Regions:
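Carboxylate-rich, polar loop motifs that coordinate divalent cations or form catalytic acidic clusters
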Residues: 1-377
């Protein structure tokens, strides 16, 4: 194990011990003890804690995407957007330039590459834009709110199989853009709640965090107050009273559809499994093995496992055995706190999670379960 790759003050190490399990114990002057396990998982990292050259600054990561060429697009809080080559080298850094109307916004909340390889970005203050990946020039798209004022905060962007771009805004609801005709539609919103008005064009909450297009042509909408479900062919919101009753009040940060078409919902109060056929919801919390009830993002691997980032580590969940395996900084992560809603799974199977200190990315097949806790007497 190369212990120098870990983030600690090497000048403060006063003693070193290797135990029977292969763990290396480091004793620090007035700083306590650090344990380095014998097998470090192949969690890769980009960020300011890197022992090599930092390519993405020191700001919190707010969005991430991997494009058709394999380049990483990383949106930050107050430092624009970075383009990183597959080998980890910085290709571009586009940041806000005061007085220049077509420069990128400072805080990028969402990134999406559409089927035409256009790159769309949603910002915290400047709304929706289409980004030229070579020049950084932004074409801002006017999205009107109910008062015809431009929408500012875009937290989620996704394309469906009908070549429609869905845009989730904070406080302004849901928008649909036809990529062929360029027409823009706004889905109405009301406080009455779609669960009380089946098959009506109503969304329960206009503060949208995340979106998911399912295989059965439904758009799931995670909001600050529960879950919405839109039938895309008919453009009607589907009433699911029991689901709304169980999820209403939850802040939803993440949505994922598994290989069996269950919808997994990451909330501020734990992980929820939704079966669209039975309309049943199952809940998982710390008492079931999660490292934290505050779920940040959810992705899946080819074996049907879920990978869940939280505000206290990453968890691998096997739905078949109903077991969680948790990973922390001591298992090779560069930190335990991950950003809300920031994740991406590439077509090659790589999973990426954004955090407060950079991005963690890995191939699930290269990650092994951590050793048992070392014996302390």
């Amino acid at each position: 194990v190369n212990i120098t790759s870990f983030n600690f003050d090497k000048s403060k190490v006063h003693s070193i011990l290797k135990d029977k399990q292969g763990n290396i114990w480091l004793g620090f002057f007035q700083k306590g003890v650090m344990i380095v396990p014998p097998v470090i998982n192949n969690f890769k990292y980009m960020g300011y804690k890197s022992s090599t050259h930092n390519t993405i600054g020191s700001c919190c990561i707010m969005s991430v995407c991997k494009d058709h060429s394999g380049s990483y697009w990383i949106g930050t809080d107050n430092d624009g957007i970075y383009r990183i080559a597959p080998d980890g080298k910085q290709q571009a850094h586009f940041e806000q330039r005061p007085g220049i109307g077509h420069s990128v916004s400072s805080t990028i909340m969402s990134i999406c590459e559409d089927s035409d390889r256009n790159l769309w970005i949603g910002s915290y203050r400047d709304g929706l834009a289409r980004l030229n990946p070579q020049t950084g020039h932004c074409e801002y798209i006017y999205l009107p709110d109910k008062d015809q004022k431009p929408v500012q905060s875009i937290y989620s962007i996704i394309e469906d199989k009908h070549r429609q771009l869905w845009v989730g805004a904070m406080g302004a609801g849901l928008y649909r853009i036809n990529l062929d005709t360029k027409e823009i539609y706004r889905c109405p919103s009301t406080a009455n709640g779609f669960e009380y008005r089946p098959l009506s064009n109503i969304l329960h909450n206009s503060w949208i965090n995340c979106l998911l297009c399912s295989t059965n042509d439904k758009l799931y909408i995670g909001t600050y107050d529960g879950l919405g479900c839109l039938d895309i062919p008919t453009m009607d919101f589907v009433s699911t009273y029991e689901i709304n009753r169980l999820l209403q009040g939850d802040v939803i940060y993440a949505l994922y559809e598994d290989l069996h078409h269950n919808i997994w919902v990451g909330t501020s109060q734990g992980l929820k499994q939704l079966n669209p056929q039975t309309q049943k919801v199952r809940e998982y919390t710390i008492s079931d093995g999660l490292p934290s009830n505050s779920i940040s993002a959810i992705e899946g691997d080819a074996n049907g496992n879920l990978w869940i980032s939280t505000n206290f580590g990453i968890s691998r969940f096997n739905p078949g055995t109903q077991t969680f395996v948790n990973f922390y900084a001591s298992d090779g992560l560069q930190g335990n706190e991950f950003s809300k809603g920031v994740s991406f799974a590439s077509t090659q199977g790589e999973i990426i999670f954004g955090s407060t200190s950079g991005i963690t990315y890995f191939n699930p097949g290269e990650i092994t379960s951590p050793n048992k806790n070392p014996e302390i007497r």
